[in-house]
Amino acid sequence: MTNMILLSAVFLSLAILETHCANHISTGISTAGEVEIRCVSDNYVKKIMAYNRDRLSDATISIIQNYKQGPYGCDGVAQSSVISGAAKEKRINTPECITTGRIGGLIVRLKSKPKEEDLGKWECYFTDLTDNVDSKTLTDVLTKYNLPNSGYFNADGTPNDFTTELKVLDYDDVTKDVIMGCKLSTDLGTPPTMSDKQPYRSVHLTGDDRYYAEGDLYSRTSFSSTPYDCTGIPQNTNKYLYNCFNVAPNEYRSAAHRPPPFIALTAPSTPSNIILDNVAEKHAFTKHFFFPAEDKAVVDLRGKNVVISPLAVSDYTQIKMKYLSVQNAVFSPPEELINKLGEVLLKELSTATKFEIVNVDNNFAPTIPGDPYKMVMIADQSCVSGVNKNVIYTGLCKKSSSMSVITMTYFSSLDCDKTSHYAYIFYTGNEPREVEILPAGIQEAVGTPPDVTASNIPENSGGNDCESTTAQDVAEKLFGHLQTVCPTIPLCQMPSTVRTVITDGECAQRPFICNNRALVEYHVPLTELTSGSPFANDWSCTAVDKQSPMKTWHKGLRTELACGLGDLKQKYIDNSLPLIVKQGEDSYKVVCSTPPSLCTDNGLTPPRLNKDDKTYTKEELMAPDDYACTDHFDRVEVKKSYELIQDHFGCEYKLYCKITPHNVRCYITNFPQCQTPAYISGTIGSDTIPNTALTPESLSVMFIKGGLVSTTSLDLSIWTIKGIKLAQFTTAADLPDACELAANNIQVTHNMDFTSAGKTVTFTCINKLPLDNTCDISAGHSKDTRYKLEISNDGSNWVALAESTLAIDGSGVKTLTSTFSKEGGIFAEGDGVFSFLFYSLNDDAIRTMYTDRSNIQARCVKMFDSSSSTSTIKAVDYISYDTYRKSLVPKEPTVTTTTESPPPPTTTTRQIHSKEDFDRVKKELGEKLYHVLFFMGVLTVSVAGGVIILSFIGCLIMRKMEDAPQKTKYSV
């Protein structure tokens, strides 16, 4: 009976685990330029879908906006919105002007793919916001509201005619989204080159009647009393505003006044007073706070670049995260704000990590010491008294992990200052590993902050009372709502490293027809999640013509994290990623699936591989200004639309090559499971890690720039350290370039004698000394001796890299147990000497030390009993990538047959030094006990079941035997 109960409990646990896994699997990360967490197979989307169907009949048709344009922009705004079915109209507080020719759109979410004849029945509607109306035709609406055929007017007040047309643009078999577009066709005399290239855009409607615009319905230009001087276009006329400001070729706007393809940020003279311009600022206080998905924002702060990649989006029934990257920004926030931020973050992070916010020399770069965090901020201090009040967290990881993502949006309180309401955006996470600024003219926006009314503040932002709402109140309210809507969202499955590369050259001046997207790479801390890594890039151009109204040719990858330690699931949206295929020994074939004649108007876009594939030689790929991306690897595997490359150590990398006007640029990224090089996980002395691989002469450290191998300059301030096993160097003469990347005559001290603390040996790189990174353990052992490897660049602040315990039992058997900090390392003991290799996992502290290499030191700390002794040893030497590359030239294999004797038995002693060790052992024992009990239960139930079945069969036989004489008796 006990075993039966046990078995029932086991199966119940498995059922719960299965449900848990299903919930994890249902959490997807959409990587087309944003992170969208949706419980795909749970109640979340179903609930929204049912809500929309109940309220809005069979479909949800979003807004078509209709504005009256003044000569300089928004004089009087007449906006309109349409929702199909019998639903009531909602007032949409959308403050932006839609200039002539702007596009509306819709997304219809149905449970199944609709028929084509059904799609044709929907039209674009224009209604007044003040009246509740059923679905009407365009003519009905215009007649009812006496509209002069449109809401558009010329500068002289005369109306313009327009027509509408509806296009079915796309259908997503996964989300069941029917993406449709409504196009406004005007007779405003658009330039001939633009007449058939008005782009289509679509708009999402979420379940709570708030609109989230995906695409671009809004002007990116701040209008002011001084119009832009558009070459060839009369000033003070709105006739060509749309083309002038947004999609016109270069000949329609002068270089001096051409707006950049970004949302512009105002760059005031005082860096501490950074304001978002009209466009971005007004968005912060509508019911849908967002920056358009394809926008980049760049502001010049006295020569310091601030790069805003697609930013934070929060709609209260969907979690959408976008990221802020800042490089060399200068801020000077008040002490009150810094202190408050520290309090809030410490409270909400709920981790053991000490969060320290520093403000040195006006460089606001708060860090968490010892952990790979960076925090940046855009802030305005006009409402300092409200800083403590209304903070909205759009994403927050509450997890005791070494990596997290925090994105906060702060809305200043209206009562503090009714003329200044600015969004505060924070991002915490690994700093971007590379930021390339798009070489477009950065232009200072002109405009004044809007006078925002209380009705425009998001409902969940805490209202407009400076004294009544705390940050905690708002955060708890928001998180409570999110957890109610989608309780299975594991918030910490957000990327913790966001690498944004704003590509150069591609469609730079065509932001609407050709959307220049950023290459975004996501790395998720996978120690507790999966063995794979989400990777995505979003590099697209949108070609618009009569035949194909809207095509985004590169949507990247849509990835989903599986449950537990399962494999990463990847759904490929299309096949337009560039492929690289190895052909022979000396050439690589680069195949780019790029549509023909895309973004080639006016020669703005470099030629792409449209028709004929080109084969590049290694020399071409390795040309100056290129990134080395080929002969570092043993082989190239083409899997679907990307490349998995395996190096000599079994570590997989992702290779992404982009064709630029002059070269092939390749990005290499390693998967998180390769943060520990694969060969380190083998057994010392085996084929995986031969003893010869651990000789001091064979160990070194090479630098890889955030996973991006470079053959050019080395900037240690932003490079990470990774351990790489080099080829077998036997003498110092084999290392001609060992110090190529180090400063000439750099002096490093080492002391390998524990007994003579004052003895030092200096050497220079010119000496080409062997890489003898060793700890001398020949003098003095106790039964339990511990060694700790540390490095320092000033001789006082030491960072522990690894710790090893050498246990020697009474018979002289040595057992080596090594534990590593987050940098990791490996120790091997032989002839009384420890050889070590260490590497850093993107650690700020280590990287900072290597910024100044004038006096880098490494030391071995020997600890036993109650005393310790320290030996300063030679620090890590440097070797150039070029030398490393040469070492990888394949050699003719030598085939030998050897007979090896079995290795002597080794006694392993488990060392328990901490509660963590004890918990780990306890967990292992518990798992073993679980398996034993499980199989005992299965065995018992099996035996019991067999007995029951046999007993039942026996009973049947007995009954048959008893019945037989009776039948015979009555038959006589």
From Swiss-Prot:
It is a single-pass type I membrane protein. One of its GO terms (cellular component) is membrane. The chain crosses the membrane at residues 933-953. The keyword Transmembrane helix applies. Residues 22-932 are extracellular. Its main location: host cell. Residues 892-912 are annotated as: Disordered. Keywords: Host membrane, Membrane, Signal, Transmembrane, Transmembrane helix. It is found in: Host membrane. It comes from the Viruses. Residues 954-972 are cytoplasmic. Disulfide bonds: none annotated. Residues 1-21 form the signal peptide. This is Uncharacterized protein ORF41. It comes from Ostreid herpesvirus 1 (isolate France). The lineage of its organism: Viruses, Duplodnaviria, Heunggongvirae, Peploviricota, Herviviricetes.
